[in-house]
From Swiss-Prot:
<dbReference type="InterPro" id="IPR046885">
    <property type="entry name" value="MnmA-like_C"/>
</dbReference>
<feature type="region of interest" description="Interaction with tRNA">
    <location>
        <begin position="143"/>
        <end position="145"/>
    </location>
</feature>
<feature type="active site" description="Nucleophile">
    <location>
        <position position="101"/>
    </location>
</feature>
<dbReference type="InterPro" id="IPR004506">
    <property type="entry name" value="MnmA-like"/>
</dbReference>
<feature type="active site" description="Cysteine persulfide intermediate">
    <location>
        <position position="193"/>
    </location>
</feature>
<keyword id="KW-0808">Transferase</keyword>
<feature type="binding site">
    <location>
        <position position="32"/>
    </location>
    <ligand>
        <name>ATP</name>
    </ligand>
</feature>
<dbReference type="Pfam" id="PF20259">
    <property type="entry name" value="tRNA_Me_trans_M"/>
</dbReference>
<keyword id="KW-0067">ATP-binding</keyword>
<comment type="similarity">
    <text>Belongs to the MnmA/TRMU family.</text>
</comment>
<dbReference type="GO" id="GO:0005737">
    <property type="term" value="C:cytoplasm"/>
</dbReference>
<feature type="site" description="Interaction with tRNA">
    <location>
        <position position="126"/>
    </location>
</feature>
<dbReference type="InterPro" id="IPR023382">
    <property type="entry name" value="MnmA-like_central_sf"/>
</dbReference>
<keyword id="KW-0963">Cytoplasm</keyword>
<dbReference type="GO" id="GO:0005524">
    <property type="term" value="F:ATP binding"/>
</dbReference>
<keyword id="KW-1015">Disulfide bond</keyword>
<protein>
    <recommendedName>
        <fullName>tRNA-specific 2-thiouridylase MnmA</fullName>
        <ecNumber>2.8.1.13</ecNumber>
    </recommendedName>
</protein>
Length: 359
């Protein structure tokens, strides 16, 4: 099989490439250049493509004796990931850019080019498993990345390979060291790759500018003025611009964002509890949509826990009734539906959260 391996320059994709070589495949490595100014991207095995990362990937390819290329996807990345990220915050949402990158860049633009060039599959260093075309959680639950892959269609998954999903991260590092790969101890990066400072509010403010609005309590009383809804997310406690706790002495959190009026609503922790979710743009990873109701578990954050729920689908809307309330769920987040399975929880579907209500 002719396999293109996406090599970030980190330990995970490096071992993935090595395993593809060991399996006897015709392997080519590719590193994605995602910025016109590479120094602005964070480095690390979860980072995206600084000059240092490209050099690390090339050195691994040399050790493995495989062809290696750097492909420029900067324009596509800006349009489909960065611009989308900014626009989502302008709408008062909280997006996950890693989900978008997998959907639009790695497994659409990159995979599409790979297939056009005659490759049979795209391999990556994601922690996830595929069995009989079904996407499952990785063996290493702490590193599992099935959540950020749940936007992939059955067609995309048919050409995907995840060589390290059956191995714990510690073992991957040990294997890299045994193979003599210099990236064996390279640290992971857990922040947004195109915001190296980690200051999301400043990044958004520089692109959106000042759009003043009011911070109000549950009764609509104005408490403060802000410089844009893009500086807030549901569940946020710090940086609200208000003095002290609420009248009950308890902390106040962002409980609602109305981008149309520029209003940010705050309330108590209990006001963050939701028991019903709705999602747009559903994707069914096996290719078959379910109607409902389906007993399942739902995850609403990349590193969040699983919550028992019942899911149903009708007219392009994915609806979830939670068995117990979840706290601080924001529009724009991805919700992923899992079917519990002793062989590895199976991803059934995903959708972009458009509504959260009830307690």
């Amino acid at each position: 099989m002719r396999v293109l391996v996406a090599m970030s320059g980190g330990v995970d994709s490096s071992v993935a490439a090595a395993r593809m070589v060991d399996a006897g495949h015709d392997v080519v490595g590719v590193h994605l250049a995602l910025s016109a100014t590479p120094g602005t991207l964070r480095t690390g095995s979860r980072g995206c493509c600084s000059k240092e990362d490209a050099g690390d990937a090339r050195r691994v390819a040399d050790v493995l004796d495989i062809p290696f290329y750097v492909w420029d996807f900067a324009d596509r990345f800006k349009e489909d990931v960065i611009d989308d990220f900014v626009a989502s915050y302008e709408r008062g949402e909280t997006p996950n850019p890693c989900v978008r990158c997998n959907e639009k860049i790695k497994f659409s633009a990159l995979a599409g080019r790979a297939l056009a060039l005659g490759f049979d599959a795209l391999a990556t260093g994601h922690y996830a498993r595929l069995s009989d075309g079904r996407l499952r959680r990785a063996v290493d639950a702490d590193k599992d990345q099935s959540y950020v892959l749940a936007v992939l269609t059955a067609q995309q998954l048919r050409h995907a390979v995840f060589p390290i999903g059956d191995t714990p991260k510690a073992q991957i590092r040990a294997e890299a060291a045994e193979r003599g790969l210099a990236v064996a101890d390279k640290p992971d990066s857990h922040d947004i790759c195109f915001i190296p400072s980690g200051d999301t509010r400043a990044f958004l403010g520089a692109r959106i500018g000042v759009r003043r609005g009011a911070v109000v309590d549950a009764g609509g009383t104005k408490l403060a003025e802000h410089e844009g809804v893009h500086g807030f997310t549901i569940g946020q406690r710090k940086g609200l611009g208000i003095a002290g706790p609420g009248p009950d002495g308890q902390p106040r959190y962002v409980t609602g964002i109305d981008a149309a009026t520029g209003t940010v609503r705050v309330g108590g922790a209990e006001d963050l509890d939701v028991s019903r979710l709705t999602g747009e743009r559903p994707v069914f990873t096996s290719g078959a949509a379910f109607g409902g109701p389906v007993e399942c578990q739902v995850q609403v954050r990349a590193h969040g826990g699983l919550a028992d729920a019942v899911a149903s689908h009708d007219a392009g809307v994915l609806s979830v009734e939670l068995r117990a309330p979840l706290r601080g769920v924001a529009a724009g987040q991805t919700m992923v539906i899992y079917r519990p399975d002793p062989e590895g929880d199976e991803v059934l579907a995903s959708a972009t959260i458009s509504g959260a209500a009830g307690r």
